[in-house]
Swiss-Prot record:
Pathway: Purine metabolism; IMP biosynthesis via de novo pathway; 5-amino-1-(5-phospho-D-ribosyl)imidazole from N(2)-formyl-N(1)-(5-phospho-D-ribosyl)glycinamide: step 1/2. Monomer. Part of the FGAM synthase complex composed of 1 PurL, 1 PurQ and 2 PurS subunits. The lineage of its organism: Bacteria, Bacillati, Bacillota, Bacilli, Bacillales. ATP binds at Y57, K96, D495, G532. It catalyses: N(2)-formyl-N(1)-(5-phospho-beta-D-ribosyl)glycinamide + L-glutamine + ATP + H2O = 2-formamido-N(1)-(5-O-phospho-beta-D-ribosyl)acetamidine + L-glutamate + ADP + phosphate + H(+). Pfam families: AIRS, AIRS_C, FGAR-AT_linker. The gene is purL. This is Phosphoribosylformylglycinamidine synthase subunit PurL. It is found in: Cytoplasm. It comes from Staphylococcus aureus (strain bovine RF122 / ET3-1). Its EC number is 6.3.5.3.
Length: 729
């Protein structure tokens, strides 16, 4: 008789306990077919988390297959803890982005902190040392106190974990819109570097080899966290606070260093982070990849308190834990290493040749499941979408007051400087950061070399909402441009697909169309997808977020010497590259004037993107350009103002466009500054101005003139978010 009080197999079926765990009737019946019997309580829980949306991608898997995943530089693509891309000299860059949206909505500090910790462990599990962190965040508007609380908590959580573990946070993006009220998006990305011969895989093979648990003792925190992340947020979500994990960055630091030492041992067979679904996913996935079985003896698992059941052990998402498979007879070597780093560890099982996932506690069997169906045979749902009717009419912007519009856009939190928030992150720890958070991609030197890794993270939610296919292309192209802007060669990307409920036809169609656009852009821009994450059911009280695919992209700088003087100077001429059109659908201007975004916009010419990108990258590396900035949210006038304010330089510009085109967000444009004495040879580059040593920012068109003090612009732009957060308290 079991020492743990749990529902019987009959009660699970009759009372439909499986539904509370997240399994549908159809899925429960499939589990019964796989087992040839009714599952017990622990087995039902295991299937529920492994077949959750968060772990199985059961609504998105068909779309992910569209993405190109191989390329000249790709060493390891989707399927492992993170993607691995060659950077030459027997070195590789390892990177991935993950979401922690639902936990951050309930417990913003811990939700964000554990999101950072989890993505770090994904990189470390490959064997790479992390070199920087990035994040992409979405919140509701800051005139709402709940959104202020969420923003403050998330930023503190990101900084609190990253700063303590000693990894710089070097880039990010934050946007605000009421569509994210109560459902913030917290996407964390980590980048690491590794030598080719140290790359690890999460595999369990070699009959008789031992399974070692290391890290924090297992508690009851985070139980069914993967299932929670696969549900819509409701008024009952607050009661699921225990599903939010608790991070410990100091143990995280010890675990990182111990893991990086362990991978130097030849006796290590495989390693995987215990992330979503905890011990269940890490162990069963390792067995599936190794074509093996596993027998875990759960009484050997280090626990925080007595009485934790097998069900709780397997579904707990206690943080700062890793699972290793090591050669039989070498266990003590690893246990001694972990003891040296003051970490709890234990041998908890072994690899078998049964292809079954067997769990015992004091010799009593609590689960006996075939490995392959558990890990690889979650049902895949192909639903029916419904095309949105796009509004092809044109809004009228002829009545706008240019100066008033300029200042309203400049101080909107989406456009305003994020330094008030980013200054809470350690951007320099490790002393390899070359370009910090600001106007373009970040750049971090590869220690001991003259190479650097450029990284960026970007999203274009309003455009994806207006036209998912074109918006999908745009988000990839935006990340590409941000890497080009620092002279990097884009190598590959990771993605985080944040959407509402796929069971709603319009949202399912958004998934179909946006991933198609993303895949096309990846193919043309030669940026294969090597890792990623899907977060669905991002809804609050029945209202969905904007469809928000986020792209993290990395690029290589072979020699950083050109960055020594890559900063705009007085006397540099300014050029605009790319055409400006009447392009306001999805723009900040449309939202400001009309309160919503629902109009079409110009399609993106991806072949032109590639050609412009190569020309600009060449001009940077040849020392012609002192600065490159992509024209983004708010349009050209806002881009020029941010350039002037960020560097404290005067600016004088004359541009032959209309007043409204000052705020157009036509894609594929760059503002570049050309060094004195240098000549720019790029087709269709138009000279538009000059950087000066005055405090004057002056932009003229045939129809208007904006003339303001740079110091005033800087004060408004840099102070807007702080003002929102302090005056509303």
């Amino acid at each position: 008789m079991s020492k743990f009080i749990e529902p019987s197999v009959e009660e699970i079926k009759l009372e439909k306990v499986y539904q509370d765990m997240g399994l549908s009737d159809q899925e429960y019946e499939k589990v019964c077919d796989i087992l040839g019997r009714q599952p017990n309580f622990t087995e039902t829980g295991i299937f529920s988390v492994m077949w959750s949306e968060h772990c199985s991608y059961k609504h998105s898997k068909p779309f992910l297959k569209q993405f190109p995943t191989s390329g000249e530089h790709v060493l390891m693509g989707p399927g492992e803890g993170a993607g691995v891309v060659d950077i030459g000299d027997n070195q590789a860059v390892v990177f991935k982005v993950e979401s922690h949206n639902h936990p951050s909505a309930i417990e913003p500090y811990q939700g964000a902190a554990t999101g950072v910790g989890g993505i770090i462990r994904d990189i470390v599990s490959i064997g790479a040392r992390p070199i920087n962190l990035l994040n992409s965040l979405r919140f509701g508007e800051l005139d709402n106190k709940q959104n202020q609380r969420l923003l403050k908590g998330v930023v503190k959580g990101i900084g609190g974990y990253g700063n303590c573990i000693g990894i710089p946070t070097t880039a990010g993006e934050i946007e605000f819109d009421e569509r994210y009220d109560g459902n913030p998006l917290v996407n964390a990305m980590c980048v690491g570097v590794i030598n080719h011969d140290m790359i690890q895989k999460g595999t369990a093979k070699g009959v008789g080899n031992s399974v070692i648990y290391v890290g924090l003792k297992t508690g009851r925190d985070g139980i069914h966290g993967a299932t929670f992340a696969s549900e819509e947020l409701t008024e009952e979500s607050e009661s699921k606070r225990p599903s939010v994990q608790i991070g410990d960055p100091f143990v995280g630091k010890k675990l990182m260093e111990a893991t990086l030492e362990a991978i130097t041992f030849d006796e290590l067979v495989g390693i995987q982070d215990m992330g979503a679904a905890g011990l269940t996913s890490s162990s069963s996935e390792m067995a599936a990849k190794g074509g093996s079985g596993l027998h875990l003896r759960l009484e050997q698992v280090p626990t925080r308190e007595p009485g934790i059941s097998p069900y709780e052990m397997m579904l707990s998402e206690t943080q700062e834990r890793m699972l290793l498979v090591v050669e039989k007879g070498t266990e003590q070597k690893f246990l001694d290493l972990f003891d040296k780093h003051e970490l709890d560890s234990a041998v908890i099982g072994e690899v078998t040749d049964t292809n079954r996932f067997v769990l015992t506690y004091d010799d009593e069997v609590y689960a006996d499941i075939p490995v392959e169906p558990l890990a690889d045979e979650a049902p895949v749902f192909i639903l029916e979408g419904e095309e949105k009717n796009y509004n092809t009419s044109k809004n009228d912007y002829t009545h706008i007051d240019v100066k008033d519009t300029f200042f309203k856009l400049l101080k909107h939190p989406t456009i305003a400087s994020k330094h008030y928030l980013y200054d809470q992150y350690d951007q320099q720890v490790g002393a390899n950061t070359i370009i910090k958070p600001g106007l373009q991609a970040s750049v971090v030197r590869v220690e001991g070399t003259n190479k650097a890794i450029a990284s960026t993270i970007d999203g274009e939610a309003r455009y994806v909402y207006n036209n998912p296919y074109e918006g999908g292309k745009m988000v990839v192209a935006e990340a590409y441009r941000n890497l080009i802007a620092v002279g990097a060669t884009p190598l590959a990307m990771t993605d985080c697909l944040n959407y509402g409920s796929p069971e709603k036809k319009e949202i399912y169609q958004q998934l179909i169309d946006s991933t198609k656009g993303m895949a096309e852009a990846c193919d043309i821009l030669k940026t294969p997808v090597v890792s990623g994450n899907v977060s669905l059911y991002n809804e609050t009280k029945g209202t969905s977020i904007f469809p928000t695919p986020v792209v993290g992209m990395v690029g290589l700088i072979e020699n950083v010497n050109y960055l020594n003087d890559f900063e705009p100077q007085v006397g540099d001429k300014l050029y605009l590259i790319g055409d400006t059109k009447d392009d306001f659908g999805g723009s900040q201007l449309e939202k400001l004037i009309y309160g919503k975004v629902n109009h079409e916009f110009e399609s993106l010419d991806l072949s032109s993107e590639s050609e412009k990108g190569e020309s600009i990258k060449t001009a940077i590396r040849e020392g012609v350009l002192s600065h490159v900035q992509t024209v983004g949210k708010g349009g050209l006038l806002i881009t020029l103002a941010k350039l002037s304010a960020h560097y404290g330089l005067g600016l004088k510009s004359s541009i032959d466009i209309t007043n409204t085109q000052l705020f157009s967000e036509t894609q594929g444009r760059y503002v570049v500054s050309v060094k004195s004495g240098k000549t720019l040879n790029i087709d269709n580059a138009i000279e538009i101005g000059l950087l000066t040593d005055s405090d004057n920012f002056k932009v003229t068109t045939p129809y208007t003139e904006i003339s303001e003090n740079v110091s005033d612009i800087k004060q408004i732009w840099e102070g807007a978010i702080a003002q929102c957060l302090t005056t509303q308290d």
